C-alpha cells in the first residue's frame, strides 16, 4: 500500500492511495495517512483509483479521517473508486457519510 500527497489548485490536498486497503495495507499507511489528513483543517481529495480492495479496517480509516476533518471545519471527498471498492463503500453506506464522486476533477468541483 502506498500514499502520495500532492497539492491541487484551490488549496486542495490530493491523497492518492495505491494497493489493497486490507489489514496489512491499512496498517502500512494508517499513520502517514492520519498525519497527512489531520495536520490542518482543509480540503482533501482521497483518490481511490489505485485501490483494488477495501476491507472494514480501511473503511474505518477513511471514516475516522473524514469525521476528524469535519469536526475541525475541513472536508474530505472520496474520488474515483474502482467498481469493487465503490460497491463496498455504497453497501456499507459510507457514501451517505462522506461525499463520493467519479473523478478527482469532480472532487475538486465539490470542494470549490
Specify the residue positions occupied by each region the protein language model found.
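Short beta-strand/loop segment at the start of cytosolic alpha/beta domains
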Residues: 1-16
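Residues in well-ordered alpha-helical elements
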Residues: 27, 104-105
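Acidic phosphotransfer microenvironment of two-component signaling modules
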Residues: 83, 105-106
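Short acidic-hydrophobic, aromatic-tinged amphipathic segments that line or gate anion-handling sites
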Residues: 99-103
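Amphipathic alpha-helical interaction surfaces in cytosolic regulatory modules
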Residues: 23-98
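Short, charged, intrinsically disordered terminal tails
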Residues: 106-112
Amino acid at each position: 500500500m502506498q500514499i502520495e500527497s500532492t497539492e491541487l489548485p484551490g488549496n486542495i490536498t490530493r491523497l492518492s492511495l495505491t494497493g489493497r486497503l486490507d489489514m496489512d495495507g491499512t496498517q502500512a499507511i494508517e499513520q502517514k495517512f492520519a498525519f497527512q489528513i489531520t495536520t490542518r483543517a482543509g480540503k482533501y481529495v482521497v483518490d481511490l483509483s489505485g485501490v483494488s480492495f477495501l476491507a472494514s479496517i480501511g473503511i474505518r480509516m477513511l471514516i475516522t479521517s473524514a469525521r476528524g476533518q469535519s469536526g475541525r471545519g475541513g472536508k474530505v471527498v472520496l474520488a474515483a473508486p474502482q467498481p469493487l471498492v465503490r460497491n463496498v463503500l455504497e453497501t456499507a453506506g459510507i457514501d451517505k457519510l462522506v461525499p463520493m464522486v467519479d473523478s478527482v476533477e469532480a472532487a475538486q468541483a465539490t470542494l470549490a
